[in-house]
Each structure stands twice: as structure tokens, then as C-alpha cells.
Amino acid sequence: MRVPSGVTRALEDPPGGGPLAGIDAGLAALSVGADCWVIVVSVDCPGIAGVLRYLLAEPLGIACDGRILRGGDPEPFDQYLMGVYRAGALRRAIDEAVARHGSVRGMGVRRVLRALALERVDVSADVCRDVDTPEDLAWWESRLS
């Protein structure tokens, strides 16, 4: 995939390791300090512009590791792939998982990131709807057309 000049592209190695392995690869490609904020978003979220509005609407707390959305259907749940995190907190959580399990390949994001001190923003299910099924795709196509 081509990306604009100045954009860093990262991919887990080997490919297909899951979202947490992708986050790990992305962090490794960045040259940022531990207190810098990193936005993590799922690639199958067509409504990402709206998601960012909720995540960045207010300053983040000094003592928190990040902010995530809480929404979904049929019951709301923490959306760890729709969040903004301190780079150091992400790195620490991933490094601890690697130390315990040898790798984050195939490991669930929730399993590793749920221990972080996160602020949560409650949103409707539509805000964080992703594309997992043909019905999801049809819903987004009707909404974006």
C-alpha cells in the first residue's frame, strides 16, 4: 500500500500477527518519547474521523495512560482499538506481555491493555461500528453515500 510522503508505514513481521503485533511494530517504527501520545485505530473503522473527535475533545489527565471509547452492540464494551495512549504505557504493556509469553503474536489487545489506567468515553454503538460482515459494509455504504 502506498502512503503519502512523510508517513511512516509499519507492518508486523511476519504479517498476520494480529492488532497487538501491529501496534508493537508501529511503536518500534516511531521515534517518540514515553510521554508522547499515540493514536491507535482499527483499520476497519470507516467512521474514524468521528472517533478522533471523541478521543481528542478534551485534554487527557496527567495520571492516565490513555483514553478509549466505550460503545458497541448489543452491550457497550471497551474499544481498545479506538484510543489514544501514552507511548511509554503502550510500550511497557507490550514488553511485559512479551516477557511473560515470548511474543504478542495472536494475543488479544484487551488481554494486554486492560491493565492500563485509561479514561473512557461512552459513545453510541454507531460511533464505533466497524466492518466485520457484509451487513456492516452495507450499513456503512448507506451512511457514507
Predicted ranges, named:
Residues M1-G106, R111-V127, P134-A138, L144:
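Nucleotide and nucleotide-moiety/phosphate-recognizing core
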